[in-house]
Amino acid sequence: YAVRNRRIIVVDDSIVRGSTSKQLVQMLRNAGAAEVHLRITSPAIVWPCFLGINTDTQGQLIAATQSVEEICDYIGADSLAYLSLEGLKSCIYAEHPQYCTACFDGNYPMPKPNPLHADAFLPDYKPTWNND
């Protein structure tokens, strides 16, 4: 195997729920990788996206509920690092000052639905609350 006894750095665009990263790290471990380090080319996704991405609630987002160390433990990586929000903005804002960063910082380009749920932007959405 090309990865046996090697230190591997995996570069990915994002971690949303963590399930894909967990599978990837496990595959590399099974192939004999000595270390697996993840580097993510976006900031941590901690807020739901209501603009077409399938993340309805913060509870679905691993970075919204777990620390970097907890995520490392869950996915089995030796280390994890994200691009900072400031780093992302420095790369994009000069050309695209209206770039949406809501999933990273919670600053939505429109009023947030209440309760926070992706379906809230559908024309016939009726919010429901659990009073238990």
Task: State what each model feature region is.
Residues Y1-D132:
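PRPP-associated nucleotide enzymes
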